Amino acid sequence: QGECAVASVYHLPIMDGSIDFLLNCFSPLAIDEFRRVLKQGGHFAYVVPAAEHLWQMKEVLYDEPYPNEVKRTPYEGFRYVDVLEVRDTITLDNPEDIFALFQMTPYSWKTPAEGVARLKSLTTLTTDIAFHIHLFEKE
């Protein structure tokens, strides 16, 4: 049986050493807090964008699109278990969905106005989605 909680990643409302598995998806990594709440031998999955995530959207937004940084970082007190790459292609077929996806990304904070205007002019967008799921075990 599982339970879910939505909270600040830096102040989880969870007792020390009480969690078997923790999922962190596109959120800041609060490694000290994860170390605190995970049981010995517990795992956490860290989901981050792969290099080409939303590449075709970035081609619309930027004159020179850039790949996302990909790294495998060791964390003290955790053993790196594995990484899984998940890829697919999605098609958004209306401007509202395209802009909603854009607003869920950090690109919405740093894209030049010209790029936003190009994106808003689209009626359809087909783009790659690509994630890395890193798995760690608390030592």
For each feature predicted by the language model, list its residue ranges.
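A short acidic, Gly/Pro-enriched loop at the edge of an enzyme's catalytic core
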Residues: 10-22
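A short, conserved alpha-helix within the catalytic core of class I
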Residues: 26-40
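Conserved Class I S-adenosyl-L-methionine
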Residues: 51, 58-80, 86-139
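Short, charged, surface-exposed secondary-structure boundary motifs
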Residues: 14-17, 54-60
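Conserved beta-strand segments of alpha/beta enzyme cores
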Residues: 3, 79-82
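Conserved beta-strand signature within the Rossmann-like core of class I S-adenosyl-L-methionine
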Residues: 41-53
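Conserved SAM-binding strand-loop segment of SAM-dependent methyltransferases
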Residues: 1-13
